[in-house]
């Protein structure tokens, strides 16, 4: 038995992967997204693959595709998967089309999206969640999960009927009493997104270059200082505790390979979503990553100049399409 129909608001990499897995498990799924993505799915369906699972296909006939929230939509659950900059607009569209009290799960990057969605759509029940894994669009209609992990969401009784559904679909969901620490733990790891995007390399190749790791370590150092000042203890989501991450990242590569073997359980296809954004000339979510660190630092009387520099670099990227080598990026961050 399914808990009901699902509407994915924002059919990008996360939305298509999670929504596609649910559809493959028999859940009625509507994907709301842009023509670039939906046209490819309409023509050839979805192809879903993962580092730890065989690839499988979801025919277009198993999905409902829409450019906007259908007027007759009445989902039991909405997965909000739009980019951070589109959160308020998407939430308002949902509120205008869906019954009051509709359950919305924010599967978005950053810290503040669920609050922003709630403010824009107070009639809806919005809960924050965290996506631990990397999903890349390998080709039109083809989405690949390149790392492992389990979804986490704010604990709420309304989500209990969905736990077996997500488990059966191969995208297991855990409920957590306090999600802020988990969200910050994920954001620390996501600080690698801009480094990876500017490198132009697959994730694993980038992490095996010490210069890029030094850049990431410097960004995490600033974030940890801000978190300490704010009294926030980030959850450990990697094999290494958050506070030790910068030290491990700065190790020589031969030693890093040994110490961080679990961290390197990334297949050759994996890359950051921000790299996909740059490749398509789209505005990135840098404000939800490094921008969040800058704001937390400022709110606690600190500065985060290297995170601010990353925001500046990514904000002008369409005008500067060159990739940055590790030494170049280190110089730009004054390392």
Locations of regions flagged by a protein language model:
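Short beta-strand/turn micro-motifs composed of small residues
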Residues: 10, 33, 82, 108, ...
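Active-site lid/adjacent beta-loop-alpha segment flanking the redox-cofactor pocket in flavoenzymes
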Residues: 200-215
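NAD(P)+-binding Rossmann beta1-loop-alpha1 motif at the extreme N-terminus of oxidoreductases
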Residues: 1-54
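A structural micro-motif
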Residues: 4, 27, 102, 124-125, ...
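Rossmann-like NAD(P)(H) cofactor-binding subdomain of soluble oxidoreductases
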Residues: 58-142
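Conserved hydrophobic helix-helix packing surfaces used for dimerization/oligomerization
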Residues: 5-6, 78, 104, 151
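Rossmann-fold dinucleotide-binding core
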Residues: 109, 113-201
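NAD(P)-dependent Rossmann-like dehydrogenase/reductase catalytic/cofactor-binding core
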Residues: 221-335
């Amino acid at each position: 038995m399914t808990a009901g129909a699902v509407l994915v608001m924002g059919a990008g990499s996360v939305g298509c992967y999670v929504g596609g897995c649910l559809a493959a498990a028999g859940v009625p799924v509507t994907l709301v997204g842009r023509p670039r993505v939906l046209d490819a799915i309409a023509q050839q369906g979805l192809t879903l693959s993962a580092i730890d699972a065989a690839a499988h296909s979801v025919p277009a006939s198993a999905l409902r595709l829409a450019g906007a929230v259908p007027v007759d939509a009445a989902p039991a659950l909405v997965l909000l998967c739009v980019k951070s900059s589109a959160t308020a607009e998407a939430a308002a569209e949902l509120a205008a089309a869906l019954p009051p009290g509709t359950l919305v799960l924010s599967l978005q990057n950053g810290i503040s999206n669920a609050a922003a969605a709630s403010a824009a759509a107070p009639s809806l029940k919005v809960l924050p969640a965290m996506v631990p894994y990397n999903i890349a669009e390998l080709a039109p209609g083809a989405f690949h999960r390149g790392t492992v992990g389990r979804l986490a969401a704010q604990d709420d009784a309304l989500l209990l009927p969905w736990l077996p559904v997500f488990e059966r679909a191969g995208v297991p969901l855990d409920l957590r009493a306090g999600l802020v620490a988990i969200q910050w733990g994920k954001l620390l790891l996501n600080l690698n997104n801009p480094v990876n995007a500017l490198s132009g390399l697959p994730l694993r190749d980038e992490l095996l270059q010490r210069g890029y790791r030094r850049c990431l370590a410097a960004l995490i150092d600033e974030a940890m200082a801000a978190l300490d000042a704010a009294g926030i203890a980030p959850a450990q989501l990697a094999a290494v505790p958050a506070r030790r991450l910068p030290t491990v990242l700065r190790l020589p590569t031969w030693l890093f390979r040994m110490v961080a073997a679990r961290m390197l359980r990334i297949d050759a296809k994996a890359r950051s979503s921000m790299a996909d954004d740059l490749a398509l000339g789209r505005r990135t979510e840098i404000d939800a990553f490094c921008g969040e660190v800058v704001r937390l630092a400022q709110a606690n009387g600190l500065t985060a100049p290297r995170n601010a520099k990353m925001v500046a670099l990514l904000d002008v990227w369409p005008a500067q399409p060159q990739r940055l080598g590790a030494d170049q990026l280190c110089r730009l961050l004054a390392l």
